[in-house]
Each structure stands twice: as C-alpha cells, then as structure tokens.
Amino acid sequence: MENALTARDRVGVQDFVLLENYTSEAAFIENLRKRFKENLIYTYIGSVLVSVNPYKDLEIYSKQHMERYRGVSFYEVSPHIYAIADNSYRSLRTERKDQCILISGESGSGKTEASKKILQYYAVTCPASDQVETVKDRLLQSNPVLEAFGNAKTLRNDNSSRFGKYMDVQFDYKGAPVGGHILNYLLEKSRVVHQNHGERNFHIFYQLLEGGEEELLRRLGLDKNAQNYQYLVKGQCARVSSINDKSDWKTVRRALSIINFNEEDIEELLSIVASVLHLGNVQFASDDHSHAQVTTENQIKYIARLLAVDATAFRESLIHKKIIAKGEELNSPLNLEQAAYARDAFAKAIYGRTFSWLVRNINKSLAYKGSDIQSIGNASVIGLLDIYGFEVFQHNSFEQFCINYCNEKLQQLFIELTLKSEQEEYESEGIAWEPVQYFNNKIICDLVEEKYKGIISILDEECLRPGEATDMTFLEKLEDTVKNHPHFVTHKFGDQKLRKSLGRDEFRPLHYAGEVNYSVVGFLDKNNDLLFRNLKEVMCDSGNPIVHQCFDRTELTDKKRPETVATQFKNSLSKLMEILMSKEPSYVRCIKPNDAKQAARFDEVLIRHQVKYLGLIENVRVRRAGFAYRRKYEIFLHRYKSLCPETWPNWDGRAQDGVAVLVKSLGYKPEEYKMGRTKIFIRFPKTLFATEDALEERKQGIATFLQARWKGYVQRRNFLHMKHSAINIQSWWRGNIGRKKAAKKRWAVDVVRRFVKGFIYRNNPRCPENEYFLDYIRYSFLMNLRRNMPKSVLDKSWPVPPPSLQEASELLREMCMNNMVWAYCKRISPEMKQQLEQKVVASEIFKDKKDNYPQSVPRLFINTRLGNEEINTKILQNMENQALTYAVPVVKYDRKGYKPRRRQLLLTHNTAYIVEEAKLKQRIDYANLTGISVSSLSDNLFVLHVKCEDNKQKGDVVLQSDHVIETLTKIAITAEKIHNINIIQGSIKFIVGNGKEGIIDFTPGSELLVAKAKNGHLSVVAPRLNSR
C-alpha cells in the first residue's frame, strides 16, 4: 500500500487513516472524489473497506486480479474487495476462527454486487475437486435465484434486495468450500400487491412473462403482456432499459437446475408464481346484501388448477371468513373491501411462504455432506451479510421501519466491534488506549426494542389488545409512552415549524442516519400479517407439494397466537447479532455516489450524508486514536532499511532493534511514534509521508547502484559463459576431429583389407571374402552408368561392364532403351507420328538405293504441295467428291517426242489424277497401277506402270517431281504399293501404247540433263551424290 503514497496528490491516499486532517469531513470527501475520478472505488479505513458504486463495469475483477490478491498480505496490494475476502480466508485457515464479512450501506450502494464478488473470489481461488466444484457452482447460482424471487426495482436501485440475507460458506480442513447455509430476513411481501410509482414487483414475474416458452405460458394460463396483470401495473414501470428479463430468465432456469431443482419442482414453483398473477386479476362485486361475490370465474379456475385445490372451496374462502366461537364454526360473508384484503393477504402469504420454502431447499442443496463426525467438526465458516440498506422514501411504512431498525443494530455492532478491536490491539501491544468520543446509537435501538416501552412492544400490545385497535390508536399510545424521548417526535408534540414537515399520522425517530418520517397507516395489519383460517384450510388440502409444505396443518390446531412480524424480526436480529459477535468480523461500507444511477457522477451532498450516518469519520478517529499508521517490525524494517547505513543492506539482529536504530537515524521525535511488542505505531501521517518521500529519493540512488552492479555482473557472467562455452567447443571439436580421424583410419584399413581379399577371390562365386569387392564393383558400375546414361535412342554408347555384370548390363541396356523409346513415343504428337510413319516407309523403299534419299530425310513431308485455291474447282467436282489426300505439281513427258508439260498430280484414297489446269488429262485407278519405276540416281523422274487392257488408259506415265521421295512415298502408302516400287540402275522400259515400248536411259554425270537421244530414247543425266 505504501507504494501508492507517491501519487497521493493525484489519486488520494489508499487509507483514510493517512489523511493529515483526518477530522475534516471535507478532506474525507475530497479523497473519495479523487479516487472515484480515477476509477479507484475502494479505499481503506484501517481494515475497513469503503466501496463507492461506480455504476459501470470496471476491468478489475478478472482471474488475473484474483491471483494478484491470493495469499498476499492485506496491506501489500491496493484496496479491493478481493483483499477483504482473502484476508478473511487466510485468517480462517491460520487462526481456525470463524469469520464474517459485514456489507452495509444504503439501497443502491452495491452491497449485493460486493457479496457476489466475494463468492466468485472463493469459487476461483479455493482448492477444488469434483464435489467442491459442485458446491462452488451451487453457491454462485443461488444468487440469481434469490435475486429473481427477492429483488426488485425501486426508485433508488434497479436490483434492490427486498429481503435480508446472511450466508455461511463452510470450508473443510483443506480450505475448500464444502457447503453453505442461508438465513433470510423480512421479505417485503407487500410489494407483491402494491408498488410505488416508478417501481416494479419482484423480478421473477417479469422474467417469466418475458422469457418463458410459449408452451410453458400456455400451461400456466399467462401471456407475455405484463400490462394484463394488476399486480404488475401499479408502478407503471414494467420495462427497464438496464434490465434484460429474457436473458435473466435463462440464467434463473439454468441456476435452478444447478442447485438441484428437478423439472417437477420448477413447474410447481412457477405454478405458484403464475397463481399470484392470476390472483391479482380476481375481481369482486357486491350482491343485494353488500356481500362480495367473485366476478372473474376464469381466474378462479386457473388458480385452482395451478395450486391443485378445489375451485369452489377456494372461491368461497375468498369471500367468507371462518370464525370459531365457543367451539362453533361460523362462515361470515365479506364485503368488497374485506374480500380484496383477503385476496391480497393470501397473495402476500403464499409468495412469502414460497420464498421461505425456496431458501430451505437451497440450503438442502448447499448442506455440507461431510461423511464423518471429524469432518463436520473441522468445518469452518465465513459469513456474508448482505442486508437491506438504510431507506428514506417519500412515503415510509412498516417495512422501512423494520429495515432501518436493522441498520441501527448493525451500526451499533459495527461501533462496538471496531472500538473493541482497536482497544484489544493497543492493549496487546502495550500502548495506552485513548478514549474516543463518538455517537452511541444504543439510545435509538432502545427506543425501538426496549421491553414494555419500546415502539415494537407498544405496537404488539396494540395488535393484541381487545377492542377496536387502529393505526391511529397505536400512534396515540406511542405518543403517551415515549413523548419525552429526545430522539422521537410526532405532529402532536412538535413545534410549528416541525408540523409543516410531519403528517398527523406520522412519527419521526432520529436515526443515526438522520430523521425519517414513518406513516402508521398499515402498521397493525402488516405487523399482524393475518391470513383467514378458511384460506389456510384450502391450502392444506393442496395437491401442489410446495403449497402443501408451505401450509402446515398444525397451524389450524395450534391455539397459541403466533408472534407478530416485528417481534419475529427483532428476535431474528438478536440471533443474527449473536452469530456475528461469535465471529471475527471484516467490514465493507458501501456508498452510493448519486441517486440517478449514473457513472462518473459524484453527488457531494448525498455522499456527505452517507459518510456521516455510516460513521466513517468516527471510524477514522477511532483508528487514529493516537496513531495513524502501524506495521509489524519485520515489514517496516524490510521496507525502509535502505534509509539507514546501519540497517542496509541487511540487519542481523532482532527486527525490533533494527527498527529502533532506523527511526533514530530518521530523526523521529519521541511524540511521533511508539514501539509496541510486535509493531511500530506512527502518530502523524506527515511523519510517514516524509519517510516515504525519503525512500523514493533513496530508490533513485539504489537503482543507479544496482543498475551498475547488475550490468557489471551481467557482462562478467556473459564473458565467463562465453569463455566456458569456447573451451567446451574447442575441447569437443578436438575430440571430435580426433575420433573421426581414428575411425577413418580403422575404416580405411578394413576397406583395404577387404578390397585386396576380394580382388584375389573376384572370380570365385560370391562368398564372405569377395562380397565387399563385388558390391563395390557393382556400385561403381552403377554410379558410372548413372553418370553416362545414353541421352537419346540414337546414342548407342554404353559403359563396359565388369565380367560379373555382363548379363545385368544387357538387361539394363535393354530396359534403358525401351524406356527412352517409350518416353519418346509418349511425347510425340499425332502429326509427328504420321510423319515418322511416312519416313519409315520412305526409309524401307529408298535407303541405300537412291542417291537423293539422304537429302529428303531431314525435310518434313508436307500433307499437300498445292492449296485448294491452286486446284480448279471443276476438277474437284469431277473427282466425284473424293477426299484429296495429296497434291503436287509435276512435269509429264509425252510418250511421243518426250516433250515436257506442266501438270498436277492429285491423289485420293482410290485414284490418282493427272490434271492440266481445268482439264482432267488422265485418271489412274490404283487397282490398275502395276508398279512404279525410279532410277537409283539423284534425278526426279519416275514411271507409273498402268495396265493397258483398260481402254481408258493410254499406257505408262513418265513424270518428274521436285519432291520425288515425298511423292512416291505418298503414292506407295495411299495406293498400298510399297513393295511395287522398283529402283533400277541403267534403263527403265515403259509401255507407250498399242504394245509399243519406250526406254529411259539413266547415266551419271556432272549435272542434271533430260533430253531425247538420237536413238529415240529419253536420256537422263544425273549427278552422282556421295551421300549414299
């Protein structure tokens, strides 16, 4: 906590005890304001936590924050609700004494949220097991259920607790939460039937209508519109922007399941809730005798079905009153006003009893399941008191009177225990106690609860006396009995000024929190809390198990008059005070910053009023009764030892002696401090502040010194580490190199030995002596083969294999060739395939037979040498639509005279055509083509031999083509005459016609020459090429 003192000017001090002007209310408020502005909502008064409701979500409740406070000393961290929770838990574990945390403050100050945060802290930080996790879940989930049935929106608070709650959380010897128990106090049942303007009924009604499933609402006879129910419209505030009833409904349903309510229990519980809504819609009318009669029969049927009672009996119980006089039973009819009273009384009774049943069943779910007596005996508890805050409304009635009486008792307990704990600490430390003046509210508690003369006793007496007792007769008796009390006044005994602010039906006690006007209207009815006997009888016969448990039949036979509500509440408070007095208390005082429920708004007038009536200034004065600050010697010495040369850096003696030396060095004056048995007490905050400022200055020098030492240490550590690492690396590397060399030598010797032996036995069958050598030879050959593989099918190179691998080498060679061929074939296109097929045919026919064949090999064969535009369309039409496969320009030599003429040779699938421009000169069917002759020289002439029996034919045809190899290959393939091509050396004879024969003489020469010789032959001179 001392760490925050350096920022005290901006964010205030974390402990009000450290305020210099601690008696100043303005200084107190200003410190609250500074912290509230910085979202620091928690501040200490010694061990008391003051909490200001921020009215917004703050990022200070995560698991990381919980871990920060877990197991840490109370003053080592900033103020927080978790610090209070952890301090109580650690005290429970170490001292084995039951603890309690008292949360107080006015309505809307955040008490309920504080209790939930404490439960969440225990759920997260305490030891866990499967059983413990179940208990944790049930403890946490009991909150939304109780809030739904016991909380409501008021003018001051959208989630105001309308009942008091004290919860014991039980822990086993390991510190794990293993059970719990809840006590509830004074549920505000009147809210069921009436709400002030701007307020709502209990949350559960709106949650059921807004979030309930259609089928559920149908079974309960409800619809979603809250405006249709009389008990929900009186406050004219059914919807609230800050409340999500639909989402809350899902939370409540899930919570009911977690705390062990089955579906039947939930259905029966909701049936009662729905019956209350229907009950509010029951209407009456007067008959001729002014007796009340029910006019809404449907509502009666719904209620009877939901509560599982007889409809007729229930209707009669609402409009008649059973009176037992001298052993005789009489049914007295009710008028309209009485019937409405009976209806509302029953609604309040059944809701109040159902709430009590709900708490009892939650307690069964939370009950400690210790398996043996020892386990039960070792269980300790931490109590959480979340009870209604002090309330002052425009109209204050019986409920506000009871609530404020409860707050008076808690304030009295707080003062007593605070003073007591302070006095005990001073006495245990051997320091004289200085009495503190404070307002003792015992006089107000006595005004309310004193026997015979207290307000409760007078109210009970008026309720029980025979005759016509009314609220006004109660007020008159109150005035007669306590009119002289200094803290009590009524309109009758007030002065002129006071009477203007006090009604004739009101009385005003002076509470510790201020004056409150209470209207006595309804005091007697609410205190009696009467329910007509015949309504009880009908409910005792209910088939709804919950209703049956809520209305015990012994009530009908018990002759003893039940205690009044006020007396029950007083007795419950007395028992609660005993419980709290038996435990070690911790306090959380909650403050509401404004009435508008707005974030970041600080209403100084409202806060000053709360600070005053909560007695916070008195609390600071008690804590500062002589000394503002106290710490154990060990903690004080550890923090401030650097300020004294004799205690820095370490003190070897007792901590108390070290502190004595330290404060002497700091120059503390005797009146500024006292030395206790285990603690040092500092009287003035300025003394502590001066010490803290000196420490902050000293920290700078220490930080510089530590930085220098640390940097030197780090550099030396790094150097030594590097040196050590270098030596290790050198050592390892040398060893590694040496080991590698030795291993290599051993390996080399072994290899040489095996290699030599293998060489000697290399020609023997495989055996241990030669297997290494043979493997090496095989490996070497394969590696050499891998590097020298043929690159194409034309590459015939192949490494020479060793004798032992001859057969394997041939197989590999064949596989390699097949693979290359397969890969090559896979890559070629259909066009290239056709080209190769033609080239293969050309090779078969002309290779090594005709001189100009080699020049044709690298040249691609063209599909046609003439385009369609070069061939006359009439010719194409005369071809009888035969598909043209090849066309080439040629030179035709006449049979007589051998005159050359330009022609076109056109090939189809069945016929060859010789064409002269637009005239078809000759048609040669392939069937009549007997052969083809060509010379072996480099000329381009060839002869097509045709059968002469066909009159259409004119004899053989002599042609010349510049692409003779391509042309003849195409003819051979198309006409299927591959084996009919004759390559002739010397002369070629051919038929001219009419049985005559022509001769072509081929002779080698220097250049190509075609001419008619003198002997009548066609002479062809062709150069001889060396390529063949």
From Swiss-Prot:
The segment(s) forming the Myosin motor domain are: 12-696
Signal peptide: which range, if any? Answer: none
Q: Where does ATP bind?
A: G105, E106, S107, G108, S109, G110, K111, T112
A single GO molecular function term of this UniProt record: microfilament motor activity
Q: What is the annotated localization of this protein?
A: Cytoplasm; Cell membrane; Cell projection, Stereocilium membrane
Q: Which InterPro entries does UniProt cross-reference here?
A: IQ_motif_EF-hand-BS (IPR000048), Kinesin_motor_dom_sf (IPR036961), Myosin_head_motor_dom-like (IPR001609), Myosin_TH1 (IPR010926), MYSc_Myo1 (IPR036072), P-loop_NTPase (IPR027417)
Q: What is its main location?
A: cytoplasm
* Location of the TH1 domain: 850-1024
Function (record text): Myosins are actin-based motor molecules with ATPase activity. Unconventional myosins serve in intracellular movements. Their highly divergent tails are presumed to bind to membranous compartments, which would be moved relative to actin filaments. Involved in egg activation by coupling dynamic actin to membrane.
This chain belongs to which protein, by name? Unconventional myosin-Ic-A
